[in-house]
C-alpha cells in the first residue's frame, strides 16, 4: 500500500539523518570528549581519530553494503545496519563512562560502517517503491536528509550537551530513535524483498577502496610530531601501499565483470570531474568544521560553547548558499555555479588564513564606507561558497549517469565528498602538526634569556597562541588552493545539454506486489 511505502521511506530517511548527524556531531563537543578519555589539550591531533575512523568506516561500507542489499534484500540489510548503529552508539557512550580512548575509536568505527550502508540502501529502496517518473522527488528528499545532517550535526551536538549536560547522551539518544526506525521498517516492508535477479557484489573493488583509504589515513598520522618529519617512520611505505591499492582499484574497476558502478552509458569526463570537485569541497568542509573550533580554543582561548558558536556563521551560510546555488543553477547552469562557488570559497579561506591572534578585534573595511567583523564575514563567505556547489555537483553527476544508476551515483557523490573529508583532514593535520613544532621552536628562541619565571611563562603562552595561529593560517591557505583546484574541475562538469546514454529497458516491477506506483 502507498501508506506502507511512505512509512518505509520515512524510516529510511530518519536513519540517513541520524547517520549524517553523527558524522559531524562530535565536532562541537571534542573538548568534553577529550576530558572524558584523558587526552591533554596539547595532543589535539589524537581526537581527530573519532572523525577519521567514522569516515573510513562510512566510505568502506557504502558501496559494498549498498550492493549487498540488491542480493540479500533491503529490509534485512537496513535492519542489520540499524542494529549495528545502535551497537556503535552504545560502545561510544560507554567509552566515555570508562574513559577508554580505544573503545571510543572502536565505537565510532562501528557507527561509521553501519551508517555508511543507510544512504545507498534507502536510495535503492526509493527506486524500488516508486516508478521512474515519480521517484526523483523521493530520492531528492533522501539526499536532503543527508545534507541536513551535515548542517545540523555540529549544532545538534552542542544543543544536546547544553540540554542534558553530558556528551554521552548524544549517543544514548540514538538508541530509541534508531529502534523506532527499525520498528517502522519491520512493519512497512515485506520480509522477502530480494531482487528476482540479484546483482553480484563487487567485494574486491570495495575492499581495495577501503584498503587504499585506510593505508593513506594511517600513513599520514604521526603520533609523535617533532617538527622534523611530516610522516612517521612507517608513513612512506604505507602511502606507497595506498597508492598501489588505489591503482589496483581503478584497474579492477576497468576490467572486472562486476563493478561498483556499471560504466554503460556513463560520460566519465564530467562524471569524474564532478566527483573530483566534490572531493575538494569535502576537504574544505571538514577542515572548517574541525579547525575553526580548534582555532577558537587554542588561539582565542574560548570555551567549547564559544568556539562552537564561531561555526554558527559558517553553518547558517551553508544552507543559504545551497538553496541559492540550486536556484541560480537552473538559470545559469551547474558549471558556472560550481566554478563560482568554489572560487568564492577559496577567497573565504584565503581571508581565514590571515586571521591574527586578536581576531575578535579585527575588522574589514568595506570601500571606506563601513567595517564588518572579520571572523563572521570570512566564515560567511566560505560557507556561502561551499553551499553554492552542493546542488550543482549532484545534479551534474546524475545528468551523465543513466537513471537506473542514480542511486549509486548519488552515493558516489557522498563518497567523494567524504573521501575529501577523510584524506583532507588527515593530510592537513599531519602538515599542521609538523609545521606547528617548527614554528614553535622558532618563536621560543625569541624569549629573552634574562626573563623572569612569570615573564617566561607568559611569553611561552603567547608563543603557543602565535604558533597555533600561524599553523592554522597555513592549513587554510592550502584549503584555499584545494578549492581553486576544485573550481577548475568544476569547469569540466556536464553542461545542461549533456546527458547520459539511456539504455532501452522496460520499467521494472516494484518491490512488492501490493505496492502500486503512482
Curated annotation (Swiss-Prot):
Any GO CC annotation of this UniProt entry: cytosol
Sites annotated Forms salt bridge with Arg-417, probably closes bottom of cavity: 147
Chain positions of site Forms salt bridge with Arg-426, probably closes bottom of cavity: 147
Periplasmic-facing ranges: 28-45, 97-109, 165-169, 222-229, 291-307, 358-378, 429-474
Main location: membrane
Subcellular location: Cell inner membrane
Upregulation: Part of the lprG-Rv1410c operon.
InterPro entries per the UniProt record, alphabetical: MFS (IPR011701), MFS_dom (IPR020846), MFS_trans_sf (IPR036259), Sugar_transporter_CS (IPR005829)
Site residues, Forms salt bridge with Gln-147, probably closes bottom of cavity: 417
Positions marked as site (Forms salt bridge with Gln-157, probably closes bottom of cavity): 417
Anything else known: Bacterial LAM blocks host cell phagosome-lysosome fusion and is one way in which M.tuberculosis evades the host immune system. Triacylglycerides accumulate in lipid droplets in the cytoplasm of M.tuberculosis stationary phase and dormant bacteria, and are used as an energy source during starvation.
Function: In association with lipoprotein LprG transports triacylglycerides (TAG) across the inner cell membrane into the periplasm; TAG probably regulates lipid metabolism and growth regulation and plays a structural role in the outer membrane. Mutagenesis and molecular modeling suggests TAG (and maybe other lipids) enters the central cavity of the P55 transporter from within the cell inner membrane via clefts on the cytoplasmic face of P55 between TM5-TM8 and TM2-TM11. From there the lipid is probably transferred to the hydrophobic cavity of LprG.
Protein name, as recorded: Triacylglyceride transporter Rv1410c
Organism: Mycobacterium tuberculosis (strain ATCC 25618 / H37Rv)
